[in-house]
C-alpha cells in the first residue's frame, strides 16, 4: 500500500510517499526559515504565499523521487489540524483535488498525532506509552493506549517550550529559530544563573500542565542586569526548561505505571533533552524513543505513515466537506473524524 502524505500546517511545505512494504520512498521538505527570520517568527500570510508557490513542485519531486505515478497511490493523507489555517488550507485543497481527480481515499491526519507516530517509522514501540509533545506551538502530555486511543493529560498554560526558546533567543540577539542556536550556544556556557522551574513540583490541578512565561520573564531580568554571559544564560535556561519537561514526563509515567515514552516535535531534536532522557533510562528504568533528526521537524513522512496506519487500522476517511481546524486537541480530533468518516 502506497500513501501520499501532505503537510502544510505552518511554514514547511512537505510531501512524502510511504510504502507499507518498502518504507519511505521519498520525503521532500521546502523550508521557509530564511523567509521568516526578519520577522523573528512565522508570518502567516507569507507562509501561505510560499505554500502556494511551493506545493506543486514539492509534490512533483516527491513522486519523482519515489518513482511512483499518482495513479498508483492508494490514499491521500493530509494534515487537517491544528495549525495556521491559511497554511492548512493549501495542503488540504491540493489533497482534496488529487483525491477527487484520481478517486483516491482522503485520509485526515492530526499534526501532533503525526509527530508522535514519526518514531514508529524507524522503531517498534509497544503500547501503552506516554507521549511528550514539544514544539514551537505545543507542549503536551498524552497517555497513548493504542492507535486513536489517546488521553490528554496536560499542556502549557501559556507559552509552548519551543516558543519560549524563540523568545529567549530574540532577547539574547541570537536570531530565529531559537531552539538550535540556544542548544549550540549552551554547550559553551555554565549553569550558573538561578532560574525557576515553573510547576515542576505541582501535584494539584496543574500536575501535568506546563508554564514557561515565568521562566522567560526571569531570563529577561537576568539579561537586563548585564551580569552573565549569553552562553551562561542560554545554558541555564535550557537546563531549567528541560528539567521541567523531564520531571513532568517521569511523574506521568509513574502515575500510570508506564515504561515507554515517545518524545515528539521539533524540540525533540534538542541535545540536552535527549541526554536527560537517556540518563533517565538508567535512573528510572524506562525506555525513551526519539525520532531521527530528519523526522523531528515538520515533514510529510510522518503524515504519510500516520495516514497509512489510519487507513489500515480504522479505515477512517473523510469527504470533501471536511475542513481544517486551527485549534483541535488530538483526542477530540479522533472523535470528530469518526463521526465524519465516509467509511464508518
From Swiss-Prot:
GO molecular function: iron ion binding; N(6)-L-threonylcarbamoyladenine synthase activity
Cellular-component GO terms for this entry: cytoplasm
Lineage: Bacteria, Pseudomonadati, Aquificota, Aquificia, Aquificales
Gene name, Swiss-Prot/TrEMBL: tsaD
Ligand binding (Fe cation): 111, 115, 298
PANTHER family: TRNA N6-ADENOSINE THREONYLCARBAMOYLTRANSFERASE (PTHR11735), TRNA N6-ADENOSINE THREONYLCARBAMOYLTRANSFERASE, MITOCHONDRIAL (PTHR11735:SF6)
Keyword Cell cycle attached: no
Stated name of the protein: tRNA N6-adenosine threonylcarbamoyltransferase
A Pfam family recorded for this sequence: TsaD
Cofactor: Fe(2+)
Enzyme class: transferase
Reactions mediated catalytically: L-threonylcarbamoyladenylate + adenosine(37) in tRNA = N(6)-L-threonylcarbamoyladenosine(37) in tRNA + AMP + H(+)
UniProt keyword terms in alphabetical order: Acyltransferase, Cytoplasm, Iron, Metal-binding, Transferase, tRNA processing
Cofactor note: Binds 1 Fe(2+) ion per subunit.
Localization terms from the record: Cytoplasm
Amino acid at each position: 500500500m502506497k500513501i501520499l502524505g501532505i503537510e502544510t500546517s505552518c511554514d514547511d511545505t512537505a510531501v512524502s510517499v510511504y510504502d507499507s512494504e518498502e518504507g519511505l520512498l521519498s520525503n521532500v521538505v521546502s523550508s521557509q526559515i530564511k523567509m521568516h527570520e526578519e520577522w523573528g517568527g512565522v508570518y502567516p500570510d507569507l507562509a501561505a504565499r510560499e505554500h502556494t508557490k511551493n506545493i506543486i513542485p514539492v509534490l512533483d519531486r516527491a513522486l519523482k523521487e519515489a518513482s511512483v505515478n499518482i495513479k498508483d497511490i492508494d490514499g491521500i493523507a493530509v494534515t487537517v489540524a491544528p495549525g495556521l489555517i491559511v497554511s492548512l488550507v493549501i495542503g488540504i485543497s491540493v489533497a482534496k483535488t488529487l483525491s477527487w481527480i484520481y478517486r483516491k481515499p482522503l485520509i485526515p491526519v492530526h499534526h501532533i498525532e503525526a509527530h508522535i507516530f514519526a518514531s514508529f517509522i524507524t522503531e517498534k514501540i509497544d503500547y501503552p506509552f506516554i507521549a511528550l509533545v514539544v514544539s514551537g506551538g505545543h507542549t503536551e502530555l498524552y497517555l497513548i493506549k493504542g492507535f486513536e486511543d489517546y488521553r490528554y493529560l496536560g499542556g502549557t498554560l501559556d507559552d509552548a517550550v519551543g516558543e519560549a526558546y524563540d523568545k529567549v533567543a530574540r532577547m539574547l540577539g541570537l536570531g530565529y529559530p531559537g531552539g538550535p542556536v540556544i542548544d549550540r550556544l549552551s554547550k559553551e556556557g555554565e549553569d550558573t544563573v538561578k532560574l525557576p522551574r515553573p510547576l515542576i513540583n505541582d501535584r494539584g490541578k496543574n500536575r501535568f500542565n506546563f508554564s514557561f512565561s515565568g521562566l522567560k520573564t526571569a531570563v529577561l531580568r537576568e539579561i537586563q542586569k548585564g551580569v552573565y554571559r549569553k552562553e551562561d544564560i542560554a545554558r541555564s535556561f535550557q537546563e531549567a526548561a528541560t528539567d521541567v519537561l523531564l520531571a513532568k514526563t517521569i511523574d506521568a509515567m509513574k502515575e500510570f505505571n508506564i515504561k515507554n515514552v515517545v518524545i515528539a516535535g521539533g524540540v525533540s531534536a534538542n541535545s540536552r533533552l535527549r541526554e536527560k532522557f537517556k540518563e533517565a533510562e538508567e535512573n528510572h528504568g524506562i525506555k525513551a524513543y526519539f525520532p531521527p533528526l530528519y523526522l523531528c521537524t515538520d515533514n510529510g513522512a510522518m503524515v504519510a505513515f500516520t495516514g497509512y496506519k489510519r487507513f489500515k487500522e480504522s479505515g477512517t476517511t473523510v469527504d470533501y466537506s471536511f475542513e481544517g481546524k486551527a485549534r483541535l486537541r488530538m483526542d477530540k480530533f479522533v472523535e470528530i473524524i469518526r463521526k465524519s468518516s465516509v467509511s464508518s
